Structure formats: structure tokens, C-alpha cells
Amino acid sequence: MSRIGKKPVAIPSGVTINVAAGNQVEVKSTKATLNKTFSSDVTFNIEDGVVTVTPKNNSKNAIAQSGTARAILNNMVEGVSKGFERKLKIIGVGYRAKAQGSELNLTLGFSHPVVYKLPQGITAETPAPTEIILKGADKEVLGKVASEIREYRKPEPYKGKGVRYEDEYVAKKEAKKK
């Protein structure tokens, strides 16, 4: 069995988990609510403040799905209790960002400003014009949003200009010599 799938998921106080028919799982807290439909190869057992994910049979797929379901459920619980955060840095002359409500205005060297509409449940802050902090309860959606913003202007390898994750290292290349 999957080593990750064997570990139980602790339910913090203030978080409730409901498992409906068809493996529809709802994780609720005062901050956020997340819903996800899991594979029919796994079962969820809630008892004594912990959730255990077990495969329905010993097939390779069911065992793999149990580990995946446990990891996703753990991220859902952590997301509704603490939340997730992703930081992006903008490097380049004249490159900047500004958060305005549910939109993010990006100036990235194009002939037009890029207006990125944030999905529901994701908020953006710009403490500095070259810094973006994305926050949300759903780790998957947060990563997708960060990836889409980075996709507008990926860091180039010569000067490092572009949008990058805060912890990202960009390998620099040397310019051609005549």
C-alpha cells in the first residue's frame, strides 16, 4: 500500500468533513469551503478527529489512488484552515503589477497592459510594484493562477527578465562573443 496513503489526515478544530455519495468530499471551515470528487477506488473513514483513506481492493490503481486522495484531502484541510500563499517576482525595467479588486493589471513590456481576472477564491496583493502575493484555499487553483501569470512573460536566460516564482532559480546563459 502507498506509504502516503497509510497516514491519517488530522482534522483541526473548526474544520468539518462530509463524504457524500459518489465520493463527493466537502471540507468546510469559517474561512472557506472546498469540494472534490474522488475516485471510486477509495473509501474515506472519519473517526476520532482523523480521516483515513483506504483502497477498496488491492489493485495497483486503487493503491495509487489512495495515496493521491490522501494528499489532495490533506491539502484541502490545510487550505481551509490556514490557506496557501504563492509569491511572484517581476524583474525588468518598466515591468510592474497592480492589484485592483478581482483583477491584476500587469505591465510586462507589451504594447498593451495585461489584465488578468482572478478566479473566485483567489486574492492578490502587490506590496511593491514588482511583487505579487497570491492567496487562496485551493492549492491546485492557486498554482494554476501563478503558472498562468508567469506564462505571460517567462524569465529569459540572458538577463533574467520576466515573471518568476520567488523561490525559482533561473540559470543564466552567457551572451555570444564575436
From Swiss-Prot:
InterPro entries (alphabetical): Ribosomal_uL6-like, Ribosomal_uL6-like_a/b-dom_sf, Ribosomal_uL6_a/b-dom, Ribosomal_uL6_bac-type, Ribosomal_uL6_CS
Stored Gene3D superfamilies: Ribosomal protein L6, alpha-beta domain
GO cellular component: cytosolic large ribosomal subunit
Domain of life: Bacteria
Keywords: Ribonucleoprotein, Ribosomal protein, RNA-binding, rRNA-binding
Free-text function comment from the UniProt entry: This protein binds to the 23S rRNA, and is important in its secondary structure. It is located near the subunit interface in the base of the L7/L12 stalk, and near the tRNA binding site of the peptidyltransferase center.
Similarity comment: Belongs to the universal ribosomal protein uL6 family.
Protein name (database record): Large ribosomal subunit protein uL6
